[in-house]
Amino acid sequence: MKIVFAEWGGFGNEDVKAAFVAEGHELIRFLFPAQYGRHNRDAETENRLSALFRQEVPDVMFSLNYFPVISRVCQQEKIRYISWTYDCPCFLLYSATIINSCNVAYVFDKQLYLDFHCAGIETVRYLPLAADTERLDRITIKRSGEQSFQYDLSFLG
């Protein structure tokens, strides 16, 4: 399958790309810097993405997190848009574009999925977060002479 992958500096880009390649999919990078119109229309982004779709003729568009501007172009060009949102709350999911028929918008928060489902929105689905366990298994942890922890508990994220 030919997948256009929106790269915008999100967490997990490398893991997801590696998983797609390992499954034999062809990836086409679409650079999507944070300053581009993620909330509203952005003519430059829309034009670049439309041109890429016409040149590459992909099977699907994929992004980590949901972006209305991408959905808008995918709807226009009749390309399936798959997003996997790991931010919560992700206010971009509440865009009117979420009901576009091109969308398959996965969220890791089951209650958020249920909220959309109960509202009759069928384009949002539930999918837990994932990690590249092979990559994580290669991380070495300092054992001998390691420094004791300064605190009993730390919060990350």
Tell me what each language-model feature is.
Residues 78-157:
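Catalytic core of nucleotide-activated saccharide and alditol-phosphate transferases
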Residues 1-78:
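N-terminal pre-catalytic "stem/leader" segment of glycosyltransferase-like enzymes
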